[in-house]
Amino acid sequence: MAFRLAPTDFEMLRTIAEYRIMTSPQLAALLSRSKKGVRDRIGKLITEGLLKEAARGRGQHRGRPERIVFLNKPGVTLLKEQGFIESQIPTSQIIDEKFHYQNHQLLLNWVRIHLNHVKTVTPGLKIRLLSHNSLFISKEFSSISVQSKTGELIRFEPDATFSIYDSNQEKTLLFFLEVDLGTEILASPKRILTDLRQKILNYGICFDTQMYKRYERLWNCQLNGFRLLFLTDTPSQMSKICSLAREMQPSDFIWVTQKDRMFEDGISANIWARGGRLDTSPQSILGSLSCRAPLP
């Protein structure tokens, strides 16, 4: 019998295009499907040449390396023909088999999946997110440009920008997210853009100049500031960033957590060190709507 693509197959292919690389547990969690069912369907899509897979580096996990999947050229062509991807986007921009930042991308994926889950746990919330390397993001909002006190133009890309709208309070909160795996320098005398201290300073300029208010036009909302979120890979890196945040007053807009906290209690729980303060009770980015929302 000839292979036929189901609507759920197009949903899976488009999701992988949006997230760039994924694992079967991520797809199962996001699409609310069984892990076995997702693995089986991935296998068929690989056989049909629409997807490819590769072994993820062993990293911190024991046993066999986790498999990651990504679009193959015929998969890209199909999504373009169906209108899911704009035809002018180069295939080379969509497929990157080198995966220099696969651990970073996969952790960013988990953040997005957790945020998506929050919407099902807390009715009345609307969450809108822009990922820095999404195929579907407008170039206008893929980066932020600010001008330093010396007149230097500084351009930087948050790993993700998202807003949470509470329909009960009719209030929108804006968040910038930085996923940190401990590969960047905390503070360099040269103040390079990847220096975490400089990153925080850049966001401070974004606040002072109210550059963040351009998202009001995108999401048709009113914004009064934002929160800068750091999600770290390890407790030790969380401690380092918290220490840095406490040194850089005012730092109340900086919130820090660690991935194990997110996986255990969910991204909306009281897992965040506000202002880098570890000597006070952790808080929730949802404030009074705080809730535990671990993935099923």
Regions inferred by a protein language model and the residue ranges of each:
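Active-site metal-binding core of divalent-cation-utilizing nuclease and nuclease-like domains
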Residues: P123-F175, Q198
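Short loop/turn segments at strand-loop or loop-helix junctions that form parts
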Residues: R56, H132, E178-G182, D233
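Surface-exposed cleft-lining segments at the edges of enzyme active sites
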Residues: I94-H100, N133-G151, T183-R191
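Nuclease-adjacent, charged terminal/linker segments that flank catalytic cores
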Residues: M1-F99, Q105, P296
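Non-catalytic C-terminal interaction segments of nucleic acid-processing enzymes
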Residues: L13, I185-I192, L201, Q210-P296
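Short helix-terminating capping/connector loops at secondary-structure junctions
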Residues: T122-L125, Q169-K171, E216-G225
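Active-site ExK catalytic segment of metal-dependent nucleases
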Residues: E157-D159, L174-R191
